[in-house]
UniProtKB/Swiss-Prot annotation:
Subunit structure: Component of the RSC complex composed of at least arp9, arp42, rsc1, rsc4, rsc7, rsc9, rsc58, sfh1, snf21, ssr1, ssr2, ssr3 and ssr4. The complex interacts with histone and histone variant components of centromeric chromatin. Component of the SWI/SNF global transcription activator complex composed of at least arp9, arp42, snf5, snf22, snf30, sbf59, sol1, ssr1, ssr2, ssr3, ssr4 and tfg3.
SMART domains according to UniProt: ACTIN (SM00268)
Subcellular location: Cytoplasm; Nucleus
Record's keyword annotation contains Nucleus: yes
Protein name (Swiss-Prot/TrEMBL): SWI/SNF and RSC complexes subunit arp9
Pfam families assigned to the protein according to its UniProt record, in alphabetical order: Actin
Ranges of Polar residues composition bias in the record: 79-92
Gene Ontology CC terms: actin cytoskeleton; chromatin; cytosol; nucleus; RSC-type complex; SWI/SNF complex
The keyword ATP-binding is annotated on this UniProt entry: no
Compositionally biased residues, Basic and acidic residues: 56-72, 319-336
A single BP term in Gene Ontology: transcription initiation-coupled chromatin remodeling
Originating organism: Schizosaccharomyces pombe (strain 972 / ATCC 24843)
Gene3D superfamilies linked: 3.30.420.40
Length: 523
């Protein structure tokens, strides 16, 4: 069986809010070249209509659009000592949102074919896929070449859903090869490990998936009805309680103008940030690292392991470089958390001044929003403790926590989540050993037998291999760490479609012989 050329391979990742896709894989795998809002509309004639081509994010993946750059201040004079004057000066710099406003402009009779990760309208989704396929190819009607497709999907798509997807791409797109990959497993493949706990923060849901030895534990997967949109709606309510101010007129923004799109633009900007609690500093590796720096003269030996575990290695090295060069911190801009108000450009209102509500976006995620559901840290604990594995393998999950999904793209989200887990569940200090010794669950408040084992170490797994330079934070591309599942799908597509035998994908001959059910034999 001849292999396919890398520049002929198509990778598509499904999503409730956006589809991500690329046509052709480079030698060094790159971020998706196209991101399309997952929606279709219907005109008066009953025909499907789609987003205009100009509204689709089709920038060159090797060029990063700096949409969150702060405007240069007109004044270059020495910074005044008065804190109020400093704050006014910082407010004069307007931030910009990464939110694509055109993507939220409603279509006529708009349909969202995928909701909470599940397909709710197959006819609309097929029409959308056909539109997406035509965007990827310059001439979809050209029969000279046919291109294999790797489709990255959630773990909970049913067998029937996978069969319908297989049938569509073979019969409608005439692909010569087709395979399906699971999103959480692709996140592990991208990093290069075989076990871990994958947390995917989506648009309307959060998926928690434990993986051991490269195998998904399907019986232990959980889904919470909390996602990026839930955080946006929470921010919208906060802004309506404490109204932002229009910079041009000095008047409050009316409640009617504080729409979900208004809150989405604030959330998708640099002024939005998760501020971690200042509780139990000793258990927080980042804060412990900071406190260690303050007493560096007393203890010159630096804890390298603590620096790496904090996830702030780059920032730490940059700080050391500045100290080495004798640069003063007084010349640096104040931290976002130290500024009471920030100015952001909101379409179509203009510059608006937003207060500290921008720090409370993730409150319903980290703290139980209601009695009907649990918080994200509680769900993670319950997943590992009750379902995922026996106590001998639980540390493999606690020590490899991966946070994916663009719902987690708010600055400080990962660090805050790890801090919450460490504060509540990590076996350190005086409280947790007592509960562990007594056989009492400190969270659920009940006696357990045998004693509940608490992890001795909770770590995020966020180190990318060096052979993916386009995905590095300083690579100057539009890569997002939250899209690592797409990178893993590209890895699987590159290796699967280059095999001499079709052991991991369905060929056109196999489809003609066995039909759509052939996809179940390739996973």
């Amino acid at each position: 069986m001849p292999s396919f050329r890398d520049d002929h391979i198509i990778v598509i990742q499904t999503g409730s809010l956006y589809h991500r896709a690329t046509f052709g894989l480079a030698e060094s795998l790159e971020p998706p070249t196209i991101r399309v809002r997952t929606r279709v509309g219907k005109n008066d004639n009953g025909e499907y209509v789609f987003t205009n081509k100009e509204d689709i994010n089709m920038e060159d993946p090797n060029v990063k659009t700096d949409e969150t750059k702060v405007e240069t201040s007109e004044s270059t004079s020495e910074q005044p000592s008065n804190s109020n004057v400093t704050e006014e000066k910082n407010m004069g710099s307007s931030f910009h949102s990464e939110c694509k406003v055109d993507d939220f402009t409603p279509l006529p009779n708009e349909i969202q074919p995928i909701q909470r990760g599940r397909v709710v309208d197959w006819e609309a989704l097929k029409a959308f896929w056909k539109h997406l396929y035509s965007l990827l190819l310059k001439d979809p009607n050209d029969t000279t070449f046919r291109y294999p497709v790797c489709l990255v999907i959630p773990t909970y798509w049913s067998l029937y859903d996978r069969e319908l997807a297989t049938q569509f791409f073979f019969e409608e797109c005439q692909v010569p090869g087709f395979t399906i990959a699971y999103e959480p497993l692709m996140g592990l493949y991208a990093i290069g490990i075989l076990h871990g706990l994958v947390i995917d923060i989506g648009y309307e849901k959060t998926d928690i998936t434990p993986i051991l030895d490269g195998q998904i534990i399907f019986t232990a997967t959980q889904q919470l009805p909390l996602g990026g949109r839930y955080m946006t709606q929470h921010l919208q309510n906060l802004l309506r309680e404490s109204l932002p101010t229009l910079k041009s007129s000095g008047q409050y923004v009316s409640k009617e103008d504080i729409t979900e799109l208004f809150a989405e633009q604030v959330k998708c900007s640099e002024i939005a940030q998760v501020v971690r609690d200042e509780q139990d500093t000793a258990k927080d590796p980042v804060k412990a690292l900071t406190s260690t720096n303050n007493v560096e003269e007393e203890d010159p030996a630096e804890d390298i392991g603590k620096i790496i575990a904090s996830g702030q290695t780059r920032a730490y090295l940059a700080q050391k470089e500045r100290e080495k060069n004798g640069e003063s911190e007084k010349d640096e801009k104040p931290d976002n958390t130290d500024v009471e108000f920030q100015t952001i450009a909101i379409e179509p209102l203009g510059d608006c001044i937003v207060g500290r509500e921008r720090f409370k976006i993730c409150e319903p995620i980290f703290h139980r929003p209601s009695n009907e559901t649990v918080s994200l840290p509680e769900a993670i604990y319950i997943t590992i403790k009750n379902y995922a594995a026996n106590y001998k393998r639980r540390n493999d999950l606690w020590e490899n926590i991966i946070v994916l999904g663009c719902g987690s793209r708010i600055r400080g989200f990962r660090e805050c989540l790890i801090q919450q887990l460490q504060f509540k569940y990590q076996l350190s200090g005086s409280l947790e050993p007592y509960y562990a010794a007594q056989g009492t669950d400190s969270i659920l408040g009940m006696t357990t037998m045998p004693p509940t084992p608490y992890p001795a170490l909770i770590n995020p797994c966020k180190i990318l291999p060096d052979y993916f330079p386009s995905w590095k934070p300083d690579a100057g591309t539009n890569a997002m760490f939250e899209e690592l599942a797409f990178l893993g799908g590209s890895i699987v597509a590159k290796t699967s479609f280059n095999e001499s035998v079709s052991s991991h994908y369905v060929t056109l001959e196999e489809y003609a012989q066995h039909g759509p059910t052939a996809i179940h034999t390739k996973q």
